[in-house]
């Protein structure tokens, strides 16, 4: 079930019910867990931001810092360390979930967090790690 606080009004068959709208999600886990969704740069709504001087980094600098499995793992680990510190969540359980191409990153991210950020995870979930099509 979806983890958010609200869900669409749907029939048992999955069709919208009139009047259209949302209802409380009885399966939401937000009363017992924090969920943070992280997208690597240029996926979802994640984008490269201008430098402190207001200029966009060069394409070469962007490739070096963001585009590639190893680059993604490095900056995501640094971001997670910063987020965990700022939100005072070091004592909270931490799980990573990666789907499709994200499984490669999550696998490496778990190791990077442990080796370079001193962050030990409670678990890792890999969804559809390969395409057998």
Where are the regions that the model predicts?
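Active-site nucleophile loop of the alpha/beta-hydrolase fold
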Residues: 40, 122-133
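Secondary-structure transition/capping motifs at alpha-helix termini
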Residues: 86-91, 113-122
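Alpha/beta-hydrolase fold nucleophile elbow
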Residues: 87-101
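Short glycine-enriched nucleophile-adjacent loop
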Residues: 103-115, 124
């Amino acid at each position: 079930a979806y983890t958010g606080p609200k869900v669409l009004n749907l029939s048992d068959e999955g069709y919208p019910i009139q009047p259209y709208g949302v209802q409380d999600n009885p399966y939401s886990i937000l009363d017992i867990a924090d969920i943070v969704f992280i997208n690597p740069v240029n996926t979802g709504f994640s984008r490269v931001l201008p430098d402190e001087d207001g200029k966009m980094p060069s394409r070469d600098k962007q490739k070096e810092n963001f585009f590639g499995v190893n680059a993604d793992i490095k900056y995501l680990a640094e971001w997670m360390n910063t987020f965990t510190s700022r939100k005072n969540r070091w004592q909270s359980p931490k799980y990573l979930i990666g789907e499709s191409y994200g499984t490669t990153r999550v696998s490496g991210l778990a190791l990077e967090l442990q080796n370079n950020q001193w962050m030990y995870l409670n678990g890792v979930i890999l969804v559809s790690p390969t395409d057998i099509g």
